[in-house]
Amino acid sequence: MQPELLLFDIGNTSIKIGLAHERQVVTSYTLRTDAGQTADDLGLKLATLLGHAGVTPQSLRACVASSVVPGFDPLLREAVARYVDCPLYRVGADLSVPLENRYERPAEVGADRLVGAYAARRLYPEFPGLLVVDFGTAVTIDCVNGNAYMGGLIFPGPRTALSALSREAAKLPRVNLDVRADEPTPGRSTATSIQHGLVFGFACMVEGLAQRLKRQLPGPARVLGTGGFAASIARVSPVFDHVLPALLLEGLRRLYYEERTAF
């Protein structure tokens, strides 16, 4: 089947772009979030991605976007209008997520968190309790109980923590976070000490928080990992029942087809 949807998961640091049809997300790309670029800059990048995927703008039925960067929205609207020329539907403004939002002030919840929770619920309807752990600029752990979004936790992501460490501590370097060890070992270099401290530290933090949050959900609850660092955590920890890199794109895809009768 030919892709007919162009999906945008717009985060603070990066934009995940997906192409999808009624059955699945076919492929995805990642761009850096740059609110300083022009609509033409973004539009030409989109045209290049579509060309690489062998998809023509005329074959697209709609664009669907989730954004946590309000300043990027006008840029996206103009780029889509000029280079894709199909309707753009935004979560929150044009599409409502069909979950009961238990936040004290529901409008405060990031669209990405709601879409991730919705995707988890649709993928795993047999489990009443779900935890969605999304690694981005921030890590979010969101709780789903039945059809209710219960809220969750937010804390700095691994790369955000690394940036703060190297910025605030003059003698500590920036390092990559590619760890091959199965267990933390006493670092015999500063780089190894930082790598193991951050990777295993975040693994233990997610394990502990997931264990405590699961006690508040009907069991057996499932823990889903997504975002750029989830695979790294999964290599050193059994905390995730499933790692789903395209979870938010899958949520956008399902949301469009579930809600399109309202268009």
Curated annotation (Swiss-Prot):
Official protein name in the record: Type III pantothenate kinase
- UniProt cofactor(s): NH4(+); K(+)
Q: Where does ATP bind?
A: D9, I10, G11, N12, T13, S14, I15, K16, T137
Domain of life of the organism encoding this protein: Bacteria
Q: Is ATP-binding one of the keywords UniProt gives this record?
A: yes
GO annotation terms (biological process): coenzyme A biosynthetic process
What does the entry list under GO cellular component? cytoplasm
Q: Which positions bind substrate?
A: Y103, G110, A111, D112, R113, T190
Q: Where in the cell is it found?
A: Cytoplasm
The membrane-spanning stretches of this chain are none
**Organism of provenance:** Desulfovibrio desulfuricans (strain ATCC 27774 / DSM 6949 / MB)
| Active site, UniProt feature | D112
- Gene (name only): coaX
Q: Which residues bind K(+)?
A: D134
- Pfam assignment, any one: Pan_kinase
